[in-house]
Amino acid sequence: MQHTTNIIHPSPLSLTGLYFYNLISGLILADVAIELHESSECEVPSSFKDFSDAAMKSGTAGNVIGAASLLINSCFLAFGISRAGHEFANILPGGLEPTIVAAAFATILAIASFTQTNRGLEKIANVAVMLLFSSFASLLLPSLANVADPIGTITYEGTNPDGLISTVSAAVPLILSSLTYQNIVPSITKLLDFDRTKSSVAITLGSFLPVAMYISWCYATLGGGVDNLTTSGAGAAALAAFSASALIGSCIACIMSLAEEYQSLTSTIFSDDEQSSVKDKFSIPAVILSVAPPTAVVLATECSDELGLGLLHFCGAIITPFLYGLLPTILYQTISKKDGESASSPSLQSCILASGAVGFIGQEIIHDVSQIIA
């Protein structure tokens, strides 16, 4: 409880700022996808690497971006496998070691990923999402009613002895990485037929929902409502379903994203016939490349909790600001060039996004340097 309090509560303003930061990032990426579609009338790629290739017309830049995308999804997958090892070890009987459970979990996901079609994997993920929302609602609504001191919970100042700035510095990268959604923006615009209004509404509401859930959960947890509820059998079952569905859904999404990137990077080794067949099903090499490295890291560190938090912090402090802060600005400026003409002056949104990304990366560098000096 203390850890949660230290990290989450003192930053309602930070959460609001992060929401608008992510919103601007998503809207700019949607503009890039729509402009790319309108200018070339081509199919906008779902792979973030191919999407960047098409926008920047540079294979080298696309490979760098693809590598960054692979790294961030690998970190998320490693965190998910590690947490699954701990969570399912507590749920399953027999007192199994978390490393064994984590290895079994990763193996099952890998087998499902290359035996099921993409549509089949999406159906599994959709079921997990439905279970996630239903279990979350069954936990949250009674927990909100069980908060003993609503005003005291809202005004609670936290217990971190290092103060507000240190708390926010530690929290922002973790929260930023957990609120990431921008990698699916090209797919969203495609599903909405590249309609600007529909895409803007979907991104605005879709990016707000995780923040609202996050704030509500923090409020219920800090107020003691969740602890009071999960002591009962029904509450404990709902919490187990919530944890399991979140891990399964997020890990499947990570594997699908990784496999798509690896399939794009290794596409030259396949013949045309094989290429046409893997559009609906991921190849075994792509799945192995996606699952094996994160699983190896998790097993080598014996499902360390510090590793998981460290990976999320690294993603939120360095990779996420680059991929979804600096990159959207660069893509927008590139796609706005007209037949050799110079790009227009950066918009206010682009300036805010780029400044925020530089600020996130800069504060992390300053923090790391100060830690080394100390």
Regions found by a protein language model. Name each.
Residues T4-I7, K57, H86-L96, R119-A128, ...:
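Transmembrane helix-loop boundary segments of multi-pass membrane transporters
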Residues C42-G59, L205-S250, H313, A317:
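TM-loop-TM module centered on a large, flexible mid-protein loop between adjacent transmembrane helices
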Residues I65-L70, N90-T117, M130, S178, ...:
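Transmembrane alpha-helical segments of multi-pass small-molecule transport proteins
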Residues H3-S39:
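Extracellular loop-to-transmembrane helix junctions
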Residues L132-P142, L247-L258, A286-V297, T301, ...:
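Hydrophobic alpha-helical segments of multi-pass membrane transport proteins
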Residues I24-G94, A240-T268, G325:
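Hydrophobic transmembrane alpha-helices that form the core helical bundles
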Residues S304-A374:
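A generic transmembrane alpha-helix motif of multi-pass inner-membrane proteins
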Residues L92-S232:
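Helix-loop-helix junctions that connect adjacent transmembrane segments
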